[in-house]
């Protein structure tokens, strides 16, 4: 598989078809809007703030996380392969007066052209949508400066995550559109950490993301059975 081929056209089309609804707080991307404050605060805490730092958001989609990091004073670049979501992201940034850049490119190509260019790299809810997650993780490690931070979030692969993320979220509660996820592409924490260990990155912490269907709210916690975030740092000199 070459650098430019680590893309699933069906995955790109899936999110392009929903592009116009990225910023609908009650639409298909409502869960991303709900968890965004948690993700943002986690990144802010672990990096001791983003003001003035160069940040790359990989698989940025319509720009929900990217734009919120720019509001915190970061110099943000959003990266995605979907043309339609990027157009929505640019338009929303224009409407809100938020300054950031968006680029249509694979992470591998961007890493080749921008080695050690960023203080912080975020790769949220993206690894489970590509054919070769190791390639993405390696590229992220090349993009971050020595001492810089990289964050990965994805879904665990087990029976509980199938019940919660596929049966519950997609089929019963209709929180996200049916077919959004493929359970076989979910990644166990041990598998993700093994891929991280193949790079200069070092895993510093892992936290779970929990959904309460009774209150329709999310919180961070120690259980990583379904959604989880891994914090890593490039500790090379």
Curated annotation (Swiss-Prot):
GO terms for biological process: methylation. The keyword Methyltransferase applies. Pathway: Cofactor biosynthesis; ubiquinone biosynthesis. InterPro entries: SAM-dependent_MTases_sf (IPR029063), UbiG_MeTrfase (IPR010233). It catalyses: a 3-demethylubiquinol + S-adenosyl-L-methionine = a ubiquinol + S-adenosyl-L-homocysteine + H(+); a 3-(all-trans-polyprenyl)benzene-1,2-diol + S-adenosyl-L-methionine = a 2-methoxy-6-(all-trans-polyprenyl)phenol + S-adenosyl-L-homocysteine + H(+). Its EC number is 2.1.1.222, 2.1.1.64. Keywords: Methyltransferase, S-adenosyl-L-methionine, Transferase, Ubiquinone biosynthesis. One of its GO terms (molecular function) is 2-polyprenyl-6-hydroxyphenol methylase activity. It is an enzyme of class 2 (transferase). S-adenosyl-L-methionine binds at residues 39, 59, 80, 124. Transmembrane segments: none annotated. O-methyltransferase that catalyzes the 2 O-methylation steps in the ubiquinone biosynthetic pathway. Belongs to the methyltransferase superfamily. UbiG/COQ3 family. This is Ubiquinone biosynthesis O-methyltransferase. It comes from Vibrio atlanticus (strain LGP32) (Vibrio splendidus (strain Mel32)). The gene is ubiG.
